Structure formats: C-alpha cells, structure tokens
C-alpha cells in the first residue's frame, strides 16, 4: 500500500535500478496500522499484517516486480513459513488484474507510513 497509495520509495527504487543496486524490501506483507491493541495471533507485529494467502502472494509478487531481490516477512512464525512456501512454489509474474486488485485495496486502508516519512 505504501507504493500504490502513497508513492513511497519510488524515487529510491528508480535510483537503485538506474545504478544497478540491489534492494531488500521491508514490510511487503504489511496491511495497515492496528486500530486497537487486540492483535490476536500477531503479537510480534507492530502493524497489521496480511493474513490471506492469495493477498500475500500478490503482495510478494508485486514487491519482487519492483527491482527487489528479497524481502523480510513479518515476525509471525506462520506468516514467515507461508512466505517461504509461496516463493518456493515458482511464483508467476504479477499480472495486470492483480495489480488492479492491490491498487483498489490500497484505497481503503491506513498504510503503515506516508510519502513524507523518512523512517518507518
């Protein structure tokens, strides 16, 4: 959502691409900020992570389409294992319908940062 809703980091990604610099992505499975202190099974996450497998797969595919060589999944063991499972299952390239879905979803959430932030 940070890139799709707030254009966060696109300048850095472009500069890295132009200079052949590898990028490690953080928070690619972040959904939004918590609205309450009830974090259920995600006690280790300061943000609400994606939990739907298909949504996570699209988020990972989108992330890896942005000149990113790797990413760090959330600190939740189940989500960490799911991310590894997904990347080990021959991820296909993200398609236009999936990008549209992610853009539509990003309109309705409170992302974990904004385009003005320097540190998240």
Describe every region a protein language model picked out.
Residues 1-120:
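Beta/alpha (TIM)-barrel catalytic core signal, keyed to glycine-rich beta->alpha loops juxtaposed to Asp/Glu
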């Amino acid at each position: 959502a940070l890139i799709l809703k707030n254009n966060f980091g696109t300048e850095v990604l472009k500069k890295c691409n132009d200079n052949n610099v590898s990028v490690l992505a953080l928070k690619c499975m972040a959904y939004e900020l918590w609205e309450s202190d009830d974090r259920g099974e995600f006690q280790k996450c300061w943000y609400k992570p994606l939990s739907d497998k298909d949504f996570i797969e699209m988020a990972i595919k989108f992330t890896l389409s942005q000149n990113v060589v790797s990413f760090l999944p959330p600190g939740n063991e189940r989500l960490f294992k799911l991310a590894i499972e997904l990347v080990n299952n021959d991820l296909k390239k993200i398609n236009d319908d999936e990008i549209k879905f992610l853009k539509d979803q990003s309109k309705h959430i409170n992302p974990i940062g904004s385009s003005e932030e320097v540190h998240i």
